[in-house]
Amino acid sequence: MKMVLSQRQREELNQAIADYLGSNGYADSLETFRKEADLSTEVEKKFGGLLEKKWTSVIRLQKKVMELEAKLTEAEKEVIEGAPTKNKRTPGEWIPRPPEKFSLTGHRASITRVIFHPIFGLMVSASEDATIRIWDFETGEYERSLKGHTDSVQDVAFDAQGKLLASCSADLSIKLWDFQQSYECIKTMHGHDHNVSSVAFVPAGDYVLSASRDRTIKMWEVATGYCVKTYTGHREWVRMVRVHIEGSIFATCSNDQTIRVWLTNSKDCKVELRDHEHTVECIAWAPEAAASAINEAAGADNKKGHHQGPFLASGSRDKTIRIWDVSVGLCLLTLSGHDNWVRGLAFHPGGKYLVSASDDKTIRVWDLRNKRCMKTLYAHQHFCTSIDFHKAHPYVISGSVDQTVKVWECR
């Protein structure tokens, strides 16, 4: 169908074309166009840059149309399959669904970690480009970068109030950043002999734990920056450290294929968990809300009665996810389905689901009660390295070797 412009629209378009030709140095073309379009020599100021603005607006609209079409296709598919609509699902049942709300670019190397701020509508990404970026996850806007590390930033963590951000790096350092006002680095801590791979705050916020390729875990006092404890026991690179919400215990995982649970106030290892057949890449503590789903799934497996927990999930290069009762050192269930290394884990705040990120480029949503993968999102163009689930808002974020951070809406 031929589109017909009004006389006024034609005049405005001609003025915009003349401005574009003049601004970009096409003098001969401009002279010819002016004669043929019967234009005056001066272009009105209001037409300055108009052609470019119209062009970019069209591109934005096309992208929006494509996103809406993808959402419509997804909705139609769910209706056909008999899935419940958003109105019938409670927030505890909302899960991330394609397409992504935002795909954020700016990092110049692989994303190593993505986390939500505990209070504000912000998220943080760490990268092998040695920077940390802050984003608004509700608008997709880039806020600022934190620079100071001289090698890959491996992990980031907030204290409970979100006033401090801790980061660790392959440059062997741990840094503390003021996240309230200045966004400056306020402390740098040295002591590890190799790549520092993970960092986590103790819930009270007065100590930070770090895990390293030097096979140790260290505890640092926030106020002074001094190392006050060193935990030893792993036989290989310690990949991740995560503290239980109560703060009395923390867990670590390693290339030695084990997970260890430690007492925070002593240097003692409470339990060593063995069942994985390859490096354990990631761990995540289950919220209290997950206890009933885990117990039901475990009861169907082994009939050993009610488990008290606390419960811990682990993801490995053996492509499996395991759920453990750390009080007795028992693996309660194994989730299989990924086609490559499992790199990130996050529990749904409602406790029914677990989401995982993998080198198979997917995010998978696991129904814990039924021990099955209920949704697969083909999330990135390269390995998925990290994932986080917001505790209060219906959002999931993921990071990848493809250098993008993606925001997924749950519904």
Curated annotation (Swiss-Prot):
Task: Look up the coiled coil feature and give its residue ranges.
Answer: 56-83
InterPro entries under this entry? Dynein_regulator_LIS1, G-protein_beta_WD-40_rep, LIS1_N, LisH, PAC1-like_LisH-like_dom, WD40/YVTN_repeat-like_dom_sf, WD40_repeat_CS, WD40_repeat_dom_sf
Q: What does this protein do?
A: Positively regulates the activity of the minus-end directed microtubule motor protein dynein. May enhance dynein-mediated microtubule sliding by targeting dynein to the microtubule plus end. Required for several dynein- and microtubule-dependent processes.
- Gene3D superfamilies, A to Z: 1.20.960.30, YVTN repeat-like/Quinoprotein amine dehydrogenase
* A GO molecular function held by the record: dynein complex binding
Q: Name one Pfam family in it.
A: LisH_PAC1
Q: Which terms does the UniProt entry file under GO BP? A: border follicle cell migration; centrosome localization; centrosome separation; chorion-containing eggshell pattern formation; clathrin-dependent endocytosis involved in vitellogenesis; dendrite morphogenesis; establishment of mitotic spindle orientation; germarium-derived cystoblast division
Spans of repeat WD: 106-147, 148-187, 191-230, 233-272, 275-334, 337-376, 379-411
> Which PROSITE patterns does the entry mention?
LISH (PS50896), WD_REPEATS_1 (PS00678), WD_REPEATS_2 (PS50082), WD_REPEATS_REGION (PS50294)
Q: Know the name of this protein?
A: Lissencephaly-1 homolog
Instruction: Name the source's superkingdom.
Output: Eukaryota
A single Gene Ontology CC term? cell cortex
**Start and end of every LisH domain?**
9-41
Give its localization: Cytoplasm, Cytoskeleton; Cytoplasm, Cytoskeleton, Microtubule organizing center, Centrosome
Q: Which SUPFAM superfamilies match?
A: Lissencephaly-1 protein (Lis-1, PAF-AH alpha) N-terminal domain (SSF109925), WD40 repeat-like (SSF50978)
Quote the entry's note on domains.
Answer: Dimerization mediated by the LisH domain may be required to activate dynein.
Instruction: Return the similarity comment.
Output: Belongs to the WD repeat LIS1/nudF family.
What does the UniProt keyword field contain? Cell cycle, Cell division, Coiled coil, Cytoplasm, Cytoskeleton, Microtubule, Mitosis, Repeat, Transport, WD repeat
**PANTHER family given for it?**
WD REPEAT-CONTAINING PROTEIN POP1
